[in-house]
């Protein structure tokens, strides 16, 4: 799976975490492992321009998704035909996300991880225009994010055990 991140926002973010959470969400949704994703981080002005151009809504927003190929969950690698190769583009605005994070009382890193999962789900056809769609999408988004955090915690614990084991062997 190829995930490219381009940061034109002027804000330093942990790009590796964005790739990790995107990769996790894509795999958890059974998207073909050959799928490609592009992520771009932009400033408020660029996001406001995209928001007006594509959604006809004024002002910036936190995340926008631009699907390329029609993908659906369940595109297992053992399927008879390979899935499409380009999942699409996710555009994030870290400055807008920072304001949301502060209002919600959590870190920018958490907000960007949440928005990355949100963007992946939009690329897969999930929406939140109707109340039932919103409940389904947000529940799935929260579960994926929680599962990713649990995976990260386990990886950290495993690496600490490995470090202790190496020190013991020396």
Curated annotation (Swiss-Prot):
Keywords: Cytoplasm, Endonuclease, Hydrolase, Metal-binding, Nuclease, Ribosome biogenesis, rRNA processing, Zinc. One of its GO terms (molecular function) is metalloendopeptidase activity. Its EC number is 3.1.-.-. It comes from the Bacteria. The keyword Disulfide bond does not apply. This is Endoribonuclease YbeY. It is found in: Cytoplasm. Its cofactor is Zn(2+). Belongs to the endoribonuclease YbeY family. It comes from Mycobacteroides abscessus (strain ATCC 19977 / DSM 44196 / CCUG 20993 / CIP 104536 / JCM 13569 / NCTC 13031 / TMC 1543 / L948). SUPFAM superfamilies: Metalloproteases ('zincins'), catalytic domain. One of its GO terms (cellular component) is cytoplasm. One of its GO terms (biological process) is rRNA processing. Binds 1 zinc ion. Zn(2+) binds at residues 118, 122, 128. Single strand-specific metallo-endoribonuclease involved in late-stage 70S ribosome quality control and in maturation of the 3' terminus of the 16S rRNA. It is an enzyme of class 3 (hydrolase). The keyword Hydrolase applies. HAMAP family: Endoribonucl_YbeY.
